[in-house]
C-alpha cells in the first residue's frame, strides 16, 4: 500500500511538469530597464523546433492556408497580409515576442468551427505586428473574426517597451461572450 501511494504521489507531482512556462519582467522590474520574457515549451513533441519565416510581400487578395500548430490539420484560409516580417523562434525583426502556457479547459468549449488555433495566431501575429500592443490587437481581431480553435492559453506579448499577458479560452460556436482577458504588466 505504501508503495502504491508513493507511485501515485510521484505521478501526480509530475503532471504540472507538462505545462509550458513563461516568466515576464517589465522595464521597471529589471535592474537595467530591459523587458524580459522567458518561454519554455515543455512539449515533448516540439523539442528542437525553431520556426523561421522570412520577410515577404504577397499580392493583394492572396489567401493564407491555416494548419493546426502541431498536428498540421487543415483548418481553413484567411486573407494573407501584403507584407510580413521576419520571424525566428518566437520573436520577429521588431523584437516582438509571443509565448504561451496551456492550461486547458472544458473540451465542449473548443470551437470546432473555428479556423485559428493558438499556434497559428502566434506566428501570424509575429509576421504582422511591430509592437506588443499591435500583436494583441491582431490576435483578438483574428480570433473574433475566424474563431479560436484551441483550449485555454495564457499568451505573453512583449516588445522592447512593454510586456502584456492575456488569457484566452475557446467558446462554443455562436457563444455570445468573448473568451479572453488581457492585462499590461505593471511598470515596476
How would you label these PLM feature ranges?
Residues 2-10:
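Sec-dependent signal peptide recognition
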Residues 110-112, 120-129:
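Second-shell loop/turn segments in exported
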